[in-house]
Amino acid sequence: MEQRINAYEKSHAMKSLYALGTYLAKSSIEQPLFNLLYFRVSQINGCAYCLDMHSKDLRATGETEQRLHVLNAWREAPFYTKRERAALAWAEAVTNVTEGHVPDEVYEAVRK
């Protein structure tokens, strides 16, 4: 497994990502949910390095293997809360924003 982005070569981009992470860490979103979102975004992006890293973070916070294994199909799985579903929909929409825009209903659900 190889790291896709060399943080030292792309320090300007990484600083922006870290700043965003720092900002979000101060929000009302709890760490286990952040970890779940990071893992889902890594699935979408196809980053094996990130999936390995975030799966370890999830397991360390008590995430179950069952939820990890079906996260790719979270819409059909009964294991996620309403809050998690709203956050997952938002994360997917933002990650795939080049395919259109974040739908209003996704934005409204995540605001709640």
Where are the language model's segments positioned?
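Short, solvent-exposed positions on alpha-helices
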Residues: Q31-N35, Y49, Q66
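Mid-chain, well-packed structural core segment of small domains
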Residues: V70-R111
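Residue-level recognition of specific faces of alpha-helices
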Residues: S16, N35-L36, R67-V70, W90-A93
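Iron-sulfur (Fe-S) cluster-binding segments and ferredoxin-like electron-carrier domains
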Residues: M14, L51-V70
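Acidic, glycine/proline-rich low-complexity segments that act as flexible tails and inter-domain linkers
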Residues: M1-L36, S55-R59
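Short, thiol/selenol-centered motifs that function as redox-active sites or metal-ligating centers
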Residues: L37, V41-H54
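Short acidic alpha-helix initiation/capping motifs at coil-to-helix transition points
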Residues: S11-S16, G46-C50, V97-D104
